[in-house]
Every structure is written in C-alpha cells, then in structure tokens.
C-alpha cells in the first residue's frame, strides 16, 4: 500500500482499498486501474502523473464519483461511497467535490453568471443566496465585466476561470483538476495555476492530473501511475507552495494532449 506521512498528521479525506476498474472492449478486458491503495489527508496538494493510458483520468473520475470501480472500496470521510446509489453519489458530489477539466465544459447557451450559478441551481439553493454567492465568485475571479458574456465570447483563460468559479461555488472541500492548463498558453496557464494554488492555500484539498512535469513538481506530493498502478509517491505533504514564477510552466502538456 502506498502511504504518506501527512495522512497521519492531517484528517484523512480519501482512502482507496484495492480499487480496480476494468472496461469491456469487445471481447477484451482493459484493466484501467489495478488494486490501487491510496490515502489522502485534508488540505493536501497532489499531482497525478504518468504516460497516456496509465489510468490517471480514470482514477480521477473514480475519486470524483463520475465512475464506479469494478472492485475494491472508496472511503470518503470513512464512508464507503462505492455502496451509494446514483442519487446518493450525485448528492455527495454536489456537497464535497468540485471539478475542473481541460475542455472547460461550460454550457454554450448560458452566460458566465448562469454557468457559475448552475451547481447552486441543481442544489436548490434559494434565489437570493444563489445570486449573492454567484456575484461573490465573479468578483473573486475577476469576471464581473464578463457577467453576461457567453462562453464563445471569452478567451481560453477566462473560460477556465469561469470553470473554476463554477467548480468552487458550492464550497467543496475537494477539487479535482484534469489537465487544467492543457488548452492554455503559458501566461494563462500560470494564472490558472496561481488560482488553484490560492484555493489550496485557503484550505481546499487539490488533486491535479497532468502530463506537464513542471506543473506536477509544484505539488507538495507527487503520485505516478503506470499501467493502472500507483508506482510512485514522493513529496513533503503540506509544505509551502513554490513561487508563482518558479519553473517554466508550459501551457500545453508535454505530449501535446
């Protein structure tokens, strides 16, 4: 089992016990995850790296309750969430987990404000509180002057800021980011990283999937996957963030995907 000292010192948020994920492709079985054991403490900042097809995104989807493991257990705050039905898993996602994706996944017909407010609508937050929290997010992410813009009227960096604002409007404790700088140039990529790291400094548990070694090394704890297995776990847990200009963060992942 891959362990880490910080989990002893900080309240455990996540525990995976021999988690496996097998996909049926025709007559073939593809083992995307193989007996993954992992513990993550509250407030950690992790990167998840490895070659294409190593299982990084599958693991992130399992952690985010977007996919169910074929075997093993996923404990979130000690509760086996693999045993929950679809409605219970959806409620757990809304309460505890935020997502940021490479492709933004904004709703094209909704304005910036409407995209940010969408999780609050789904959570049935009252309209007055919904507006207040949405405007607070727009202000915090420098998007007030883009409140009524549609996604195709925004730059890539602005779209990703909208996506992060939407992901955190419900105040989740866990933020999962899958190649968050992959579609951005260097300047916008660094700005997105700065925002994510500020959210971590504010107390959120942050897990970033990336091909970019320079981005991965910014994390305090660095996990490496290969062929569906965790094969490396290095770092010092909750140490200080590197400076905003450390490293030459590329705006695109190292293999261009």
Predicted regions and their residues:
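ABC family nucleotide-binding domain
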Residues: 11-225
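ABC-family P-loop ATPase nucleotide-binding domain
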Residues: 1-22, 232-257
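H-loop (His-switch) and adjacent beta-strand-loop-beta switch element
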Residues: 222-235
């Amino acid at each position: 089992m891959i362990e880490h000292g910080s989990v002893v010192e900080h309240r455990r948020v996540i525990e995976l016990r021999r988690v496996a994920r097998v996909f049926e492709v025709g007559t073939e079985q593809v083992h995307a995850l193989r007996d993954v054991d992992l513990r993550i403490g509250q407030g950690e900042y992790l990167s998840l790296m490895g070659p294409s097809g190593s299982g990084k995104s599958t693991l992130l989807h399992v952690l985010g309750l977007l996919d169910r493991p074929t075997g093993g257990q996923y404990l979130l705050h000690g509760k086996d969430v693999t045993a929950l039905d679809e409605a219970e898993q959806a409620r757990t996602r809304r309460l505890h987990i935020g997502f940021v994706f490479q492709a933004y996944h904004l709703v094209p017909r909704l304005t910036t404000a409407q995209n940010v407010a969408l999780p609050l609508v789904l959570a049935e937050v009252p309209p007055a509180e919904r507006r207040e929290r949405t405007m607070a997010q727009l202000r915090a992410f420098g998007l007030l002057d883009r409140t009524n813009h549609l996604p195709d009227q925004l730059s890539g960096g602005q779209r990703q800021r909208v996506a992060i604002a939407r992901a955190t409007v419900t105040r989740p404790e866990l933020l999962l980011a899958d190649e968050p700088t992959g579609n951005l140039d260097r300047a916008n990529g660094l700005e997105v990283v700065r925002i994510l790291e500020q959210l971590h400094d504010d107390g959120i548990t942050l897990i970033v999937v990336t091909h970019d070694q320079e981005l991965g090394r910014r994390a305090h704890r660095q996990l490496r996957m290969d062929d569906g297995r965790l094969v490396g776990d290095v770092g010092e847990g909750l140490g200080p963030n590197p400076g905003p200009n450390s490293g030459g963060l590329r705006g695109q992942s190292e293999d261009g995907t």
